[in-house]
């Protein structure tokens, strides 16, 4: 598996300048090795192509974006450099996947969240620890941290070997709807960014966490193309609004697949 991953990643590196895909951190810096113990990397299993990020919320469950789903996935937990393996890095496959289908009033983008149950639990270690669900809703103006192995150029064609991190701000709904007029007023999404531009999540950051005031508040969803445009904050699935559903599924209430 490791040899396949190395060969596949070398091919991806050669092709990355010709590829364009889903979402990356613009204007950030390499994350500190110790600040992303919950960050998960999702790969397409057959080709071992890097797809998205995700967030470990306990020893056997990962939260990511629904649009990151593929027929066959492989997840790396405790990874930093794509080409340098930590001793405690762990790989897992999904055993179950769940999608939010609880309301016809929500758009597909509102429902852009997926729960993945790992085929076996992971162990906490130097580079692995889960991130709890939020205990309170986020506040407009909060300083938030977004991270991922996504594109680091607005044109989306440069992918890093290591995750990048950057601070952005939570934007109010009025500013968000000016940028995205078709966004419903009742949308279960968050807007975050820097209104001057130049800093943003980007392609292949999708599915990764938005952490505001120390709490896991968002899942990278989608944004402008090119990334990091002025007055175009990115959109994030609002995790707090899905707390009940997530807890229901992870507690074993999988038949309803909806909050009680």
From Swiss-Prot:
Residues in Peptidase S1 domain copies: 25-251
Superkingdom of origin: Eukaryota
Root EC class: hydrolase
Location of the protein in the cell: Secreted
Cellular component GO terms, alphabetical: extracellular region; secretory granule
Residues spanning the signal sequence: 1-18
Residues that carry a glycan: 101, 105, 124, 253
Propeptide: 19-24
Expression across tissues: Expressed by the venom gland.
Keyword tags: Blood coagulation cascade activating toxin, Disulfide bond, Glycoprotein, Hemostasis impairing toxin, Hydrolase, Protease, Secreted, Serine protease, Signal, Toxin, Zymogen
Enzyme Commission (EC) number: 3.4.21.-
PTM text: N-glycosylated.
Pfam families, sorted: Trypsin
Disulfide bonds: 31-165, 52-68, 102-258, 144-212, 176-191, 202-227
Catalytic residues (positions): 67, 112, 206
Keyword presence, GTP-binding: no
Keyword Protease applies: yes
GO molecular function terms attached to this record: serine-type endopeptidase activity; toxin activity
GO BP terms in the entry: proteolysis
Miscellaneous notes: Negative results: does not hydrolyze the beta chains of fibrinogen (FGB).
General function of this protein: Thrombin-like snake venom serine protease that coagulates human fibrinogen by hydrolysis of the alpha chains (FGA).
Family, as annotated: Belongs to the peptidase S1 family. Snake venom subfamily.
Quaternary state and interactors: Monomer.
Name of the featured protein: Thrombin-like enzyme acutobin
Organism of this sequence: Deinagkistrodon acutus (Hundred-pace snake)
């Amino acid at each position: 598996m490791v040899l396949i991953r190395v060969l596949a990643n070398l091919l991806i590196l050669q092709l990355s300048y010709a590829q364009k895909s889903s979402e990356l951190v613009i204007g950030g810096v390499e994350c500190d090795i110790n600040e992303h113990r919950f960050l998960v990397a999702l790969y397409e299993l057959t080709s071992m192509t890097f797809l998205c990020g995700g967030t470990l919320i306990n020893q056997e469950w990962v939260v990511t974006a629904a649009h990151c789903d593929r027929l066959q996935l492989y997840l790396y937990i405790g990874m930093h450099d794509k080409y340098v393996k930590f001793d405690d890095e762990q790989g897992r496959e999904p055993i179950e996947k769940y999608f939010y289908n609880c309301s016809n009033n929500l758009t597909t983008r509102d429902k852009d969240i997926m729960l993945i149950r790992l085929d076996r639990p992971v162990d906490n270690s130097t580079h692995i620890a889960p991130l709890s669900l939020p205990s309170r809703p986020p506040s407009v103006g909060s300083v938030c941290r977004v991270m991922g192995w996504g594109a680091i150029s607005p044109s989306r064609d440069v992918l890093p070997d290591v995750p990048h991190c950057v601070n952005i701000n939570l934007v109010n709904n009025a500013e968000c709807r000016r940028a995205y007029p078709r966004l419903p007023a009742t949308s279960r999404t968050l807007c975050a960014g820097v209104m001057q531009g130049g800093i943003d999540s980007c392609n292949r950051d999708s599915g990764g966490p938005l952490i505001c005031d120390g709490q896991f508040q968002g899942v990278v969803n989608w944004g402008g193309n090119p990334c990091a445009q002025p007055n175009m904050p990115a959109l994030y699935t609002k995790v707090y609004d899905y707390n009940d559903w997530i807890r229901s599924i992870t507690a074993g209430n999988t038949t309803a697949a909806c909050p009680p």
